Structure formats: C-alpha cells, structure tokens
C-alpha cells in the first residue's frame, strides 16, 4: 500500500490492525478466529446436562438450512458502501448482521478494475473515510491497487471478515409484510432472512458492452476494462480501444508504450483537465501520523476546493466558462495538430458529461503508433473493426473501455415489496427514492448510492458517509422501537422527487448531451443537483413523520 512493507495505515478511531496483506494471511476469507476451548464441566453440571439433554433440539448438520432466527441487518455488497455500513453498525453495537458478496474478495469496483493505470480521479485524502484516514498514501491521487489495500485494511481493522459471506450471489429480495422480514434468495444456497436489508452493491458493478454488430464474430482477443486479462501480452500487437471515457484515458497511455499500433475509436470527445498528482514525501506521511489534525485540515481544504468546483460543473455560470477555458488551454498545450484538436474539443457544456482528469492522455494520442478514429463503428468482423467509411481495421486485440451499466432504471435482481410490488417495474422509466435511501412500498430497505445520490464535483465517499449515517438512524428506529415495518410515505417521496427534478432541469447534466447520467427518455436518476454540503444537510435529520410504521 505504501512505500515499505513495514509501513501501515493508522487511525485515531479504528482499532489497531495488522497491515492488510498480513491480515489476509492470518485467516482465510470468511473464516472466524478459532475460539479458546471451553472450561470443563463439573460433575454437577454434567448431571444437569443429562437431565435436559432430551429437551434440547439436536445440533443441525453444516449442510442443512441455517437457523430460523433472522439477522438484524442484511447487506448486499462488500465494496466501500457495504463495508462502511458494517462499520457503522459495529460502532453502534449492532453485531447481528451479514454481508453477502457475490465475488471471492472485498473491494467492489476496485477489486474488478485492475486495468493498467487504474486510479482515482479524486485526491486520496478525500477518497477515504473520515473516520479511518490513511496517512501513508503514496501519491496525491492513488492507484487502484493502493485503494484496494486500504479497503482490506478496513476489513481487518474493524473485524468485518467474520460477517462476510463470499460467493453469495443474491438473485432476489422478497419482503414478508406479515413477519416484517426480507428474504434474500441466493444462487445455489439456502435463503437468508433479516429484519432490514441494505442494498450496497454500488452503481459501478456490471460491465457494459457497446451495442455493436458482430462482437461475437470477432476472432481476436477481447478484453473489457472491468475484466482485465493480465496474462495477455500486448507487446507488438495491433490493438484497438473502444471508448474515450474515464477508464480509457488511463488505459491508453499505458498501452501505447507496449503495442505495435493503437487505434482509439472515439464517439464523443470529453472535457479533460490537468491532474495535479505528485508523490507524497516521507515528511508528509510522518506529519500525518504524528499530528492527525494536520491530515484532517488537508482533507477539509480539499473538500472546500471541490465544493467550489460545483459552480463550474453543475450549473451554467461564469465559472463554467472559466473551466472550459482552462480545459481548452490544457488541450492546446498538449495537442498542436489542428485537426486532432478539433476532434478532441467537445461541443457540449463542461459538466454535461463526466469531466476527465489526466496529464498523459493527450500526449499518448500524439504518439507515432497511435491513431484517433472518429468514424462510427459499423461492425466487428472476424479480423477487426469496420467503420462507417468502409475501412477495415485489422486487429489482434479489442479493448472495450466502455465502463459500467449504471442502473438508472430497473434493479440488478428482482426486489419485491408490499402487496406484490416489483421495484424493477416501478423503476422502468427511471429510479426514484426518498433522499436516495428509501422507496415507498419497500419497508425496512435502505439503498446506498441510490437514485440521485451521485456527485459531480466532490468525493463519492463524502456523500456515502452521509448516507451511512441516515441509514443507521433508520435501522436504529426499526430495531430500538421493535417495529415490524418502517416505510416512507408515498406523498413524502413524491414531493421530494418533484422538487429534485425541478432543480435538475437547471443543471448542466440536463443541458442536452447524451450521458450515462440520463435514461433514454432524458430522466436524471443519477445525480444530486447541489453542493455536497447541501446533500449532507439533507441527510442530517431523520424525520419520523416522513415514515409510516407498524409495531411487532
């Protein structure tokens, strides 16, 4: 994670922990620590045990159904969101929870995205939990492997591994209104029940492939950025990259140094701004470890700097024009060819699509072995890609840097609420929720990174922490008051979303370009139309009057 094997993350609030890699060696994933042997029974106790033995139920075999008693909370997903929720529950004294993870390790998008150059476009000191700071980040913008190490640290430091069930793929969630329980149907396993369910699988979990004819016909190597094949040797190969989004601008500079030729197929150019990345000096790490308040001050400064950026990317303001001028200057400095510069200049307002951060993307496109192709792709043939101008591009490998299928509508699996309601059907034209967390008709269910919780300018983890606190308040209300149902009122949800969409209509996201923020009908179910400070204020209070409840 950091520069030496001996270095490790430290935090004021988290318990001391072995460094992530060492911790992983101490216990296999999903296994509990071995308990000490119980003390021997006295003769009197043995006699008492014999008298009551006939009354006790026989011990169930390991292969039989789990105990009937449901868990308090069931969490779907072991990425940042799911682990963050688990930490909040543990710190609140709620230990009876289980995390269901379809993969064989934690990490979510950072476990899956291991392509060359994978990194975060938010500064490391802001892309981490405020309650578990890492003083040992190696760079101001850390790579994916280092972020994954941080996630493993969270599991170790907060004792989460015993709660995680790996290779547990949820295929459906069903609510039993009579008992007030959610049942998780699992692929090839017995179902699990809980009083509350938390959907924490995140929006960036399912790889998206473009709708192009002939994908199955192509006989060469196919690699998706979210399913990278590290065994494939790119040396001397003729390679194509489809897409010029966030993953592509990181992959292209890495591949260009290895391949014989690189063809970049661009549908729409993006706004690209410089990335102020630098190596963290040792004295800086020492200062953060010795004086944690100094790191908190840096985090606070980064937070407010990014809050200022909201004026540029969310709404059309003088700062928007300034941001566009800075992006154009970045392009002019790095690309001298007039034709290429025109092809790389967007025709939409900055912020309408995701703004990219890179220092080496433009220089990579100028390499002698790189070709930028802006003709639409007609189809994939057996040997390569055919573009709309009739040119056949013969290739050894096609890289799909086409991101994720972000759920703006529907659900990743059936979610059935009260009275036979099915969430996928209700969200078919666009997802809606109350404060991005709760959905009317689906009691005791909490979403993390739910509808309209996306940040356009600040750290996703800032938004996530606000969601964790709000969801925890709901779980506390449910458990502490021994409720069977806790369900947001439909009128409250409708009023909230009416105001939300009215505000979204005035944002750059809704200014006319096509992006993954919007549904095909132009409905924005993804982004929050405001500052992170406004989002946090919205999530700071849990109004009991906004919810219907029913006691057990």
Tell me the role of every PLM-derived stretch.
Residues 18-63, 67:
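Low-complexity, polybasic segments enriched for Lys interleaved with small residues
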Residues 64-80, 84-105, 192, 199-336, ...:
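Rossmann-like dinucleotide-binding core of oxidoreductases
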Residues 71-164, 266-267, 333-339:
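Beta1-alpha1 glycine-rich phosphate/pyrophosphate-binding loop at the start
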Residues 134-153, 165, 242, 314-322, ...:
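Short beta-strand to alpha-helix junction loop
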Residues 139-205, 379:
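Feature captures the FAD/FMN-dependent oxidoreductase FAD-binding
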Residues 321-394:
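Alpha/beta-hydrolase fold catalytic core
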Residues 397, 401-475:
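Glycine/threonine-rich phosphate-binding loop and adjacent beta-strand/alpha-helix elements that clamp
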Residues 462-465, 469-552:
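C-terminal active-site-capping segments
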